[in-house]
């Protein structure tokens, strides 16, 4: 249980199935009364557009950062995006048929992720009434769709505390 705010999460994962297969690791998220989990999602997919991106399952947010992007979201929700690495080169660092490691860090308004040691995205999210620095649940997603298999192992969570 619990709803950590500042965390470092590492997990090995693999996804098998058709190109529509989709999953993710949700963090700083909330569970709605209908069971749907909304919030940040470090995305996992068989299709290039979504694998290794930061998606927000909250209505009206969607894709926050593609692979290789550094995004700053201000209090009004305006986004400033910088491409720090080629998304196709980062795509080549992912093993589509084997195990990969996600390493997600959330501290204050900043969230970032690596896959297999390569930085995929960095986001500073200060949008008002969102979850940029909120505490929330961690969840593993199996997306609706055709038959697929998603496996996770060696999940490690470290709750980060501020230095006193």
Map each language-model feature to its residues.
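Carbohydrate-interacting regions of secretory-pathway proteins
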Residues: 1-164
């Amino acid at each position: 249980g619990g709803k950590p705010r500042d965390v470092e999460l590492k997990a090995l994962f693999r996804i098998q199935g058709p190109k529509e297969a989709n999953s993710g690791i949700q963090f700083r998220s909330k569970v709605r009364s209908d069971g749907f989990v909304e919030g940040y999602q470090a995305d996992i997919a068989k299709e290039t557009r979504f694998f290794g991106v930061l998606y927000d399952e909250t209505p009206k947010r969607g894709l926050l950062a593609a692979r290789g992007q550094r995004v700053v979201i201000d209090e009004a929700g305006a986004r400033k995006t910088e491409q720090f690495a080629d998304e196709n080169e980062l795509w080549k660092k992912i093993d589509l048929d084997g195990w990969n490691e996600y390493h997600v860090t959330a501290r204050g308004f900043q969230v970032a992720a690596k896959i297999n040691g390569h930085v995929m995205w960095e986001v500073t999210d200060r949008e008002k009434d969102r979850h940029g620095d909120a505490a929330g649940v961690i969840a593993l997603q199996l997306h609706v769709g055709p038959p697929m298999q998603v496996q996770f192992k060696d999940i490690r969570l470290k709750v980060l505390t501020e230095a006193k």
